[in-house]
Amino acid sequence: MARGHRSQIKRERNANKDTRPSAKSSYARVSVQKACFVLDAIRGKDVQTALGIVTYNPRYASTLIKKLLESAIANAENNNQMNVENLYVAECYANKGPTMKRVKPRAQGRAYRIEKRMSHITVVLDER
């Protein structure tokens, strides 16, 4: 059990928080595997290069990740007063979300289950 006053506990928790600019998309309608193809391409790159990669990537996940990356850049500029030229993609990952289960009718009265997977995508930036 935690000791101390509630405000003291909150103060300590906030002191340990990660202050790097980030953006998160929850319940994105793309599977983790498909999102990771794009995320692997931009990990470790500077933000201008990463934006170029996701802009010209034909995958559907790249449109979601481009929006997320632009949001993280705006957070870095407005909330953390960081310079855009020095930013790079420090972390980017996709975690598994819930799965929507659907039924597809098949031949001779059978039914197949269709699983529409979701993911939670996170992009974290940092300065070099």
Task: Enumerate the language-model features and the residues they cover.
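Ribosome large-subunit tunnel/peptidyl-transferase-proximal elements
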Residues: 2-94, 118-128
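Strongly charged
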Residues: 97-128
